[in-house]
A protein has these predicted regions:
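Histidine/cysteine-enriched polar flanking segments
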Residues: 1-132
Length: 132
């Protein structure tokens, strides 16, 4: 799928205590990544990833004043049947759902996770170790 021969070091979100890159950037295929919108960290990510030859698409993020390292729409869970998109009960949820519906050809299922996010995780992160 990736067939990459290099490791790219990326910055972390200031409030992120987990160090999970899946809060900021996700591979869609071997050449294309989706990353948080062009806030400060998003611009750094885009520059780094484009320098390494990747195509970069932007995805909405929660407002800066509300976002922690785990309040991320990019920490979605993708299965063969659907994309489960984390939402938080905030205004930008609608924008993120619309963006996901354009990005993926399978159904997008919003999942309210404010308590899960507050505890330091997201949908993709909690799925590690599960067999699909």
């Amino acid at each position: 799928f990736l067939h990459r021969k290099e490791v790219v070091i990326i910055p972390s979100l200031e409030k992120d205590i987990t160090g999970h890159a899946d809060n900021m950037v996700r591979f869609l295929d071997g050449q294309t990544v989706v990353c948080v919108e062009s806030d400060s960290i998003g611009r750094q990510l885009q520059t780094i990833l484009q320098y390494h030859g990747l195509d970069v698409l932007e995805f909405p993020s929660a407002p800066d004043e509300d976002r922690s390292g785990v309040r991320s729409y990019l920490n979605y869970l993708e299965t063969d049947e659907a994309v489960f998109l984390p939402v938080f009960g905030i205004d930008t949820d609608t924008k993120a759902i619309a963006a996901a519906e354009k990005l993926f050809s399978k159904p997008v299922e919003p999942v309210m996770i404010p308590h899960l996010a507050a505890d330091g995780s997201g949908l993709h992160s909690i799925s590690w170790g599960m067999s699909w």
